């Protein structure tokens, strides 16, 4: 292959926006190992740096859009040790992300300080690596926002925002059921959870309270029993992680 033709490839890669691949191609051409590659090895050598860069850029974008607060949380730290006990088999299953295609949820339970938020953050971080559209929110902040919008005369903004949260592929809610709401708040939560379930978009959450206790902590309006039961049945369908601080 002539020098003109080989550098023409670099130009084409540049024009395709594959600058990193073009640079690697030029490095190979000017290096002593040029004749050592098979065609497949050459292609892999040129494309891999571009692919890695693309994946890293996607991860950084996903992480920024996720609004994740603790960006230091990592999956490898979420296993039974001298400080905490997990049901490790379930945690490992969650990190495979098989639950996404099945539309299953994941609840992380434990007392204050058990490490629930850390695990939820680690799953969110890995979801960003896996290129899932993710959003990490405080449960109370989410509910307050939707409740305020639902009480305004212009319901278009409320409907639009509800659809937005419903369509996020993976919604991460920290401290679920930490605040009690009126009948209107329970109605808002019911619509959100039902919509996400219908769309088969998983919701992952932390909570201090078991599903059987949610009725007591989510709201105490007697007319809300049906909606509370609907929330519990839908949201508790999936994986359960219990964290015990030792």
Kindly give the residue locations of the regions a language model identified.
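Charged, compositionally biased N-terminal leader segments and the immediate start
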Residues: 1-16, 21-22
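Interdomain "pre-motor" coupling segment immediately N-terminal to P-loop NTPase/helicase cores
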Residues: 18-70
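N-terminal pre-Walker A segment at the start of P-loop NTPase domains
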Residues: 72-97
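Short glycine-rich substrate-engagement loop in P-loop NTPases that contacts/grips substrate
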Residues: 84-91, 134-166
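Walker A/P-loop nucleotide-binding motif
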Residues: 102-119
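Post-Walker A helix-loop "phosphate-sensing" segment adjacent to the P-loop in P-loop NTPases
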Residues: 124-137
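Loop/turn-to-beta-strand initiation segments
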Residues: 132-133, 167-171, 199-205
């Amino acid at each position: 292959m002539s020098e003109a033709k080989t550098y023409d490839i670099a130009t084409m890669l540049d024009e395709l926006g594959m600058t990193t691949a073009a640079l690697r191609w030029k490095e190979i051409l000017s290096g002593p190992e040029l004749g050592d590659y098979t065609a497949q090895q050459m292609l892999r050598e040129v494309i891999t740096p571009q692919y890695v860069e693309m994946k890293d850029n996607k991860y950084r974008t996903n992480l920024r859009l996720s609004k994740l607060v603790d960006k230091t949380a990592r999956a490898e730290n979420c296993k039974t040790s001298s400080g905490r006990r997990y049901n490790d088999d379930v945690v490992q299953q969650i990190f495979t992300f098989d639950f996404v295609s099945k539309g299953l949820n994941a609840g992380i339970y434990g007392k204050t300080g058990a490490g629930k938020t850390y695990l939820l953050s680690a799953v969110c971080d890995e979801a960003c690596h896996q290129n899932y559209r993710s959003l990490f929110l405080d449960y109370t902040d989410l509910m307050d926002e939707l409740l305020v919008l639902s009480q305004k005369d212009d319901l278009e903004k409320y409907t639009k925002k509800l659809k937005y949260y419903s369509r996020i592929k993976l919604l991460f809610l920290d401290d679920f059921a930490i605040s009690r709401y009126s009948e209107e708040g329970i109605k808002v939560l019911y619509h959100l959870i039902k919509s996400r379930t219908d769309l088969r978009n998983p919701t992952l959450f932390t909570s201090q309270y078991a599903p059987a206790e949610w009725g007591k902590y989510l709201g105490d309006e007697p007319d809300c029993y049906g909606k509370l039961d609907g929330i519990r049945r839908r949201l508790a369908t999936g994986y359960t992680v219990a964290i015990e601080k030792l």
